[in-house]
């Protein structure tokens, strides 16, 4: 019932995805061979395990996951990794050539050749579902495969399953840490697609994750494994309500209804609490007020945009563990009252919370935060400036045009991204009075 089909693409997406499955397996007590190893008498972990797993013969649980890449490297390391044996072997779909950090290769040439084999696997998995709720895609926007082929897959799935939710976990290029020089091109072309074809995008970026590792977790030299662990904690938190019994449940669609006031503005900031360094865990008492306070803290956001520079249109919090819903509601109202200037006043009750009874492994309680803040425009604005600087000189364009792309497509993507920034700005500046006037104008026009 209510299954989610997980798709990971490119090196970044596959590494995040592999970590995510380790976390989910831990929560559902599934060992690395795919068998249930829990001891609890109620077996709560199994009650709705079919959201993410298929039950195969012999009591094995197989992830509903599709893994794709344009080169074999990452796939092979996942296969050799601790949970490599749990995936269905047919669900690894990969090419040999690589996309060379080129969006056009992922979207139009190399990726387009491989896409049909990926769609076959997606169809097979979707047919295995009782009532498919939607898809979750892990990818980065700076490279070639995750961004180019990832967005190609999203648009194809959109055509074939128009009424299913499409949730993405998208790793944006970081402001200071750059992997390749053409990141701004790849990211802008991807955002152009995500605005049109995705329903909900969780925006992540490495720099914010590094900052959390340095400042909060006190890690001296964090690895990608540490960063991916943070992301997977959040991914597990977003869907815990679907996988475990809870007092206030939410699913992908309810999340969307509560978070998206205007269809194009579906890029969210995410956060997770409690984040404590390994050494100081035993000195901290976890309480609902403390979770709430850390969760709303700007330092806790997993993307480099500061919520204090904008206003929240909407937000949603998912709490996990044994706690009183009344206390959760009081704390959330408290946050809104104390920081009312950071919330738009023309959407009353714009913060929702849900509570799930089962905490993550090793913690008594935890919470996940998803916010739709106008300050996310900082991310887009930054990428857009870098894009314009290069595009004005037509730098590196030949890599894209030689794969059959047209300059026009770049211009369209650029203006779509600039429109998005302008829309966020417009709603950031809007006040309740203006909003009412607009309503009246609208009514007069209809009359």
Curated annotation (Swiss-Prot):
* Cofactor annotation: Mg(2+)
- One GO MF term: GTP binding
Please list the residues that bind Mg(2+).
71
- Where is this protein localized, as stated in its record? Cytoplasm, Cytoskeleton
Q: What GO terms describe the biological role, i.e. biological process, of this protein?
A: microtubule cytoskeleton organization; mitotic cell cycle
Q: Could you name the domain of life of the organism this protein comes from? A: Eukaryota
The positions annotated for binding GTP are 11, 71, 140, 144-146, 206, 228
Keyword GTP-binding in record: yes
Function text = Tubulin is the major constituent of microtubules, a cylinder consisting of laterally associated linear protofilaments composed of alpha- and beta-tubulin heterodimers. Microtubules grow by the addition of GTP-tubulin dimers to the microtubule end, where a stabilizing cap forms. Below the cap, tubulin dimers are in GDP-bound state, owing to GTPase activity of alpha-tubulin.
Q: Which PANTHER family match?
A: TUBULIN
Which protein, by its recorded name, is this?
Tubulin beta-4 chain
Which species is this record about?
Zea mays
> What gene name does this entry carry?
TUBB4
């Amino acid at each position: 019932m209510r299954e989610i089909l997980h798709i990971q693409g490119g090196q970044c997406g596959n590494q995040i995805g592999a970590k995510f499955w380790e976390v989910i397996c831990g929560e559902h007590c599934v060992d690395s061979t795919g068998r249930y190893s829990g001891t609890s008498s109620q077996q709560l972990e199994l009650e709705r395990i079919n959201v993410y797993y298929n039950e195969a013969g012999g009591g094995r649980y197989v992830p509903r996951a599709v893994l794709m890449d344009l080169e074999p490297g990452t796939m092979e390391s996942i296969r050799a990794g601790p949970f490599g044996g749990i995936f269905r072997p047919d669900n690894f779909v990969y090419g040999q050539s690589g996309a060379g950090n080129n969006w056009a290769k992922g979207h139009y040439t190399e990726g387009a050749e491989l896409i049909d084999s990926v769609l076959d696997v997606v169809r097979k998995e979707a047919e295995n579902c009782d009532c498919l709720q939607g898809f979750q895609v892990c990818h980065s926007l700076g490279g070639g495969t995750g961004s180019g082929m990832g967005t190609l897959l999203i648009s194809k799935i959109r055509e074939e399953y128009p009424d299913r939710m499409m949730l993405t976990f998208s790793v944006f290029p970081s402001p200071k840490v750059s992997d390749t020089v053409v990141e701004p091109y790849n990211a802008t072309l991807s955002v152009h697609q995500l605005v049109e074809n995705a329903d909900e995008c969780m925006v992540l970026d490495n720099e914010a994750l590094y900052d959390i590792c340095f400042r909060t977790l006190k890690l001296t030299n964090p690895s990608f494994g540490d960063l991916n662990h943070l992301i997977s904690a959040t991914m597990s938190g977003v869907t815990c309500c679907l996988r475990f019994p809870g007092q206030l449940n939410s699913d992908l669609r309810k999340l969307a209804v509560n978070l998206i006031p205007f269809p194009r503005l579906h890029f969210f900031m995410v956060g997770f609490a409690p984040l404590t360094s390994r050494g100081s865990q035993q000195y901290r008492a976890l309480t609902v007020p403390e979770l709430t306070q850390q969760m709303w803290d700007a330092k806790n956001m997993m993307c480099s945009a500061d919520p204090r520079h904008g206003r929240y249109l909407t937000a949603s919090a998912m709490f996990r563990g044994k706690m009183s819903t009344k206390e959760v509601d009081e704390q959330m109202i408290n946050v809104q009252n104390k920081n009312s200037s950071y919330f738009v006043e023309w959407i009353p009750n714009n913060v929702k919370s849900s509570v799930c009874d089962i905490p993550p492994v090793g913690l008594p309680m935890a919470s996940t935060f998803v916010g739709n803040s106008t300050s996310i425009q900082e991310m887009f604005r930054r990428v857009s400036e870098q894009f314009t600087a290069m595009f004005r000189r037509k730098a590196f364009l030949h890599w894209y045009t030689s794969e059959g792309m047209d300059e026009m497509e770049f211009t369209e993507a650029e203006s779509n991204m600039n429109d998005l920034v302008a829309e966020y700005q417009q709603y950031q500046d809007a006040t309740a009075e203006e909003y009412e006037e607009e309503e009246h104008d609208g009514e007069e026009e209809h009359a």
